[in-house]
Amino acid sequence: MFMDIPAIYSVYRGGKVKAAPVNIEGADISFVSDPMPLEYSADELDDRMPLLVADVRGLGKGGLDDRLLTNMKFPGSDVWFMTCIKDVEDVFDCFMGNIAKVLMPYHSVRNGIVMEEVYEVTENCIPVLFVSKGVVLHRNEGATGIGTALSELERIGFREIIVFDTDSTLRSDDWASLHEKSPDLIPFVRSKGATVDGIGFQKVIFDL
């Protein structure tokens, strides 16, 4: 079954869960306007469909925003929660909240051993490759090729891997090539558009 998965960028501020559009430059994520209280209705999504919630403060400061985790409530949705993950303990901390999947940014994880440990302890964690200017952000502020990063994760055993095109530089033929190599790959695009249409992906994430 094909899934369109909406993504929201959230923060816990002033005693409320709030959200707003963001600007992304490399690994830096910042709100482009003041976050507003989230007006959410379960009717907006199909029953039990995933909803991606990005922890903007956690991604920015390099650690989980536990106030967002404990206060966000999205009845009727399976929450996919993306925050800074450095080690296995961070993954366990995320599962203290009411979430279905932890999304693990490839560039925030300390090393490849942690990736292997995460794969061994849970099947509910999905790596996320942040792509900027056509390359994947890597640890220590470096970069690597998309194919290289995918191969590393697939050798560990991951099949569902999110490729987050943060600056919309990937073209339709890029996505088609990635799908041919990794059919279970999940594109994450900044807006719904033609770049991933008709290629055959089973899930696509897009900014709400």
Describe each model-derived feature in a short phrase.
Residues 1-77, 86-89, 124-127, 131-161, ...:
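Conserved N-terminal beta1-alpha1 strand-loop-helix module at the mouth
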Residues 4, 92-114, 162-168, 187-208:
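Glycine-rich phosphate-binding active-site loops on the catalytic face of alpha/beta enzymes
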Residues 21-23, 98, 175-178:
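Surface-exposed, active-site-proximal loop segments in enzymatic domains
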Residues 41-46, 71-73, 93-95, 117-118, ...:
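Generic structural signal for hydrophobic
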Residues 65-112:
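Glycine/small-residue-rich loop that forms an oxyanion/phosphate-binding "nest" at active or ligand-binding sites
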Residues 72-82, 121-133, 176-190:
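Short beta-strand/loop segments at the ligand-binding rim of alpha/beta enzyme cores
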Residues 109-153, 193-208:
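Short histidine
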Residues 146-196:
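Hydrophobic secondary-structure block in the mid-to-C-terminal portion of proteins
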